[in-house]
Amino acid sequence: RSTETLEEYLSYAKVKQDELKDVGGFVGGTFAGDIRKAAYVEGRDLLMLDLDNIPAGKTEDILKRVAGLGCNAAVYSTRKHSSYAPRLRVIVPLDRTASADEYEPAVRKLASLIGIEFCDPTTFDVARLMYWPSCCKNSEYVCEVYDRPFCSLQGLLGMYGDWTDIVQWPRVPGAEAIEKRRLAKQENPTEKKGIIGAFCRTYSITQAMEKFQDYMNLQIWKEDIPIQVEQR
């Protein structure tokens, strides 16, 4: 537990909140070269879900749903959890390592069995890191462990007609609308501040390509041929 109250924590800027809840974390898988990016995932042994959209007073309902899965699982509350705004993390060990391709359809199917509408839309990322649990000094901390057989990866994937068909994957309701709003808020390049904005207001893409084509060719030539180029 930390020294600030939940009310104080919620009043902090996001940067400070992130600093306080960063008590280390885990992925539950392996990466080539220890590079935590989707392209480097070698396998995942844990399915992990952030349930950030649980209705007030429904913590026990979620715990019952997880218990009803009948497989090994752990549930703990995340930093902002409260009885009026529950936030829980669900961890489910697999009976075999999931490949990078298998992970997302498997974790989405698991989410649908619990209630995918409660999930953070970004929680299905194969390279996502989860923080170890922490809480404020007056927070309600939830931690439940269900000591049962590991979840069958093939059992989850077998619930699909074809698990490689992304059209069949369960989705968080409204996730597409959220993404569209996020993209709509992206800053217009010509309205950016500083040198980037000034450059974009001066040159269109085609104008920039024409203006700097000779320089681009020189740079490519210098990178492809390992010799010293004398600048005149």
Question: Where in this protein do the model-derived segments appear?
Answer:
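A short linear hydrophobic-aromatic micro-motif
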Residues: 71-77
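Short secondary-structure junctions and interdomain/linker hinges
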Residues: 20-23, 27, 73, 117, ...
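Modules that initiate DNA replication and primer synthesis
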Residues: 38-68, 79-116, 131, 136-138, ...
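Short coil/turn linker and secondary-structure boundary residues
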Residues: 4, 15, 54-57, 98, ...
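Short, glycine/charge-rich beta-strand/loop segments that flank catalytic centers
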Residues: 28-32, 78-80, 125-129
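DNA replication initiation on ssDNA origins
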Residues: 1-46, 56-60
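Basic/polar, cationic surfaces and motifs that engage anionic cell-wall
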Residues: 119-180
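Intrinsically disordered, low-complexity segments enriched in small/polar residues
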Residues: 22-27, 31, 37, 153-159, ...
